[in-house]
Amino acid sequence: MATFVDGPVRVSVPATSANLGPGFDSLGLALSLRDELEAEVLPEGLVVEVEGAGADGVPRDESHLVVRAMRAAFDLMGEQPPGLRLSCRNVIPHARGLGSSSAAIVAGVVLARALIAGGQLLASDEALFDLAADLEGHPDNVAPAFYGGFVISGREDGHWYAVRAGVDPRITAIAYVPPAGVETSVARGLLPESVPHADAAANAGRAALLVAALTGQPEHLLAATRDWLHQDQREAAMPETLALVRRLRAEGVPAVVSGAGPTVLAFGAADTSGLRAACPDGWACHDLTVDAAGATLLT
C-alpha cells in the first residue's frame, strides 16, 4: 500500500511550441513561460483553486485536466488519495497554441508521483511521459513540457519516444498572442485526410533541415521553417495569424504558427526587441528563450 507524503508539493511546467513549421506532431520546444501548481493530500474531498490565464474558463471539479491527469497517474501507481487540494497559477495562455493542455497534463502526472513516497520506484520518467502522451493524444507538446529543450518525438511499436537535442544558444523567440483563441480540435478539423506525395517529401526535407538549424546552424531557420502540410490549411480559423506569418517571412523573419495556433512564433537572434514593432494591435507579445528544463519540482 502506497504512503502519501505530508504537506504540499509544487511543480513548474513550461509553455511549449510544437510543429515549428514542418515538424507536424513531431518537433517541439520548451519556452520560458511557466505555470506553477501545488497539490497536497487531504483527508477527503477535492479542492481546486485557479488563478491567472484561463481561470474563468476551467472547471473546479474532477473534470479539471490537471486532476484527470493526477487520477490517471495515481491509477498507474496503484493508489488513489482520500482527498486532494490543487492550486494552479496559470501564466500560459489557453487555446493559443502554446501547450497549455500539455502543461496541465504533465503537471498532473508529476505532482501525483511526487505525492507518493517512493513514487519514482512506482513510475519511471518514461512511464509518466508515456501516460502524458496517451492523455494528450500526441507527443509534440508533452515531450518538451516534460523533458525541456528541443525534443523530437513520435510513436513506435505502440510506445511513445522522445529524443532531446541541444539548441544553439543564439536562438531566441518572440510569441505574438492574439486576444481570441482557437480550440485545437477546430484547427485539426481543417486538415485534409491525405496530402500530395511531393508536399510530404518537401516537408520531410525541411523538418530535417530544421533540426540542423536549431541545433547549430540558425542561419537556415527561414528556409527550415517552411511548411506544406498544416499552416495554410488552417487559415479559415485564423486568417490574421497566417497574414502575420506571411508578412514576417516576407521580411526575412523565420515565423510559424505555434502548435495549432493562433499564436505566431518568430525566431530571432539574441535580441528580439526589434520584432516587437510587428505585434498587431490588441495582441500580446512575449520575448522568450528556449527553456532547457522541463517539468521541475520546486522546494
Task: Report the location of each language-model feature.
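DPxDG-like acidic metal-binding loop motif
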Residues: 33, 98-121, 146-148
